[in-house]
Amino acid sequence: MHTNTGFPADFLWGGAAAANQFEGAYNVDGKGLSVQDVTPKGGFGHITDGPTPDNLKLEGIDFYHRYKDDVKLFAEMGFKVFRTSIAWSRIFPNGDETEPNEAGLQFYDDLFDELLAHNIEPLITLSHYETPLHLSKTYDGWVNRKMIDFYENYVRTVFNRYKGKVKYWLTFNEINSILHAPFMSGGISTSPDKLSQKDLYQAVHHELVASALATKIGHEIMPEAQIGCMVLAMPTYPLTSHPDDIIAVMEAERKNYFFSDVHVRGTYPGYMKRYFRENNIELDVTEEDLEILKNTVDFISFSYYMSTTETADESKRKAGAGNILGGVQNPYLEASEWGWQIDPQGLRVVLNEFWDRYQKPLFIVENGLGAIDQLEKDENGNYTVNDDYRINYLSAHLSQVKEAIKDGVDLMGYTSWGCIDLVSASTAEMKKRYDFIYVDRNNDGTGTLNRYKKKSFDWYKNVIATNGEDL
């Protein structure tokens, strides 16, 4: 009998980023505006009428002009894969055009060629919180069924353009986050306090249909390609062993499993039909929609930063006391500087839960520690960051990944989030830094944009070189 004792030989080690958080060049070479260009304080902050100087994402870290040097650094670490996104509004500036912007297409051609020249496979997210602003303002984003057609035109264009170059695709980043951040995730311009549950779940339905349609089209154009969904994953623990808390956990987890259930099984689960029925949510669902949904994904990818804890006792809930998406504080866990509770074992839990539920290959496409880094000189006079706290975080999580592989989980790869400093999604700041390469840019926008290797750079290089044996 074969036993899994460690990371497989073909394991895809790498790092991850998103176009809107690091490319910059927001109005260069014909690019249109996206929802990110009007959220200077992050996904949960206020929305401006247009781009404002305090929006760090407009310049990002200027990856658009510096990608060749950055890819060399990724290659030096030994990356097998690099996850990024295509900025939809680089390809279709408004989103509803029929003809694409050639300069935008050419940029990604050049980027993918550069990655492949360094033996790095591109892993590409089609929509990573980057809905063209015009589609948000004119159509109210994914609430409108027309979005499916616009997305179809976009994905057909990029699939045809990059077939043979990109074999790993994700349809939507953290697709379940639309329930918590409808503007950032779904381009929905209606304010959350006025957005009905019916319209919100109609937008969810449109995204699910579009995702399945992209999977169908992708397999037709690129039979060799692997197309996955991407969800925000957080295992949920009960605060107590009271049966009411156990039910609260079940209900909370279903809000997330719903998205992966549809992607993997190709149909709406019974518990969501009950939820719609009991909340008087009547969706516009056509027979054609139901047929399209049957186009299921090849693998499940997810982000993992934290677990969450649930209770049925409303008196135990305090505003801001839990993690990013609610819940209550877990008394057994420490938290990051941004209040995200750190739970390496939760990653093993979620890997096993996904595997037991679906028996589909899995891919960890985001994981990392957001922290304040201090640039200082080493003994040779070179600038670095002594980020042992980050090494400890990643080592603890990867140790649990190894345990999950021993449990029998089929895991394709791991891309740490923010392998180079970028503008954070939730708070739109530079000081919340993630992994291996420090970028000299400050929250006020000043800085040289010079790149410096952190201590974790060499640590991760060794992890990859030993295929996870040395953590």
Question: What residues fall within each predicted segment?
Answer:
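A common structural microfeature
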Residues: 10-12, 64, 81
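Glycine-rich, proline-tolerant flexible connector loops at the mouths of alpha/beta enzymes
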Residues: 86-100
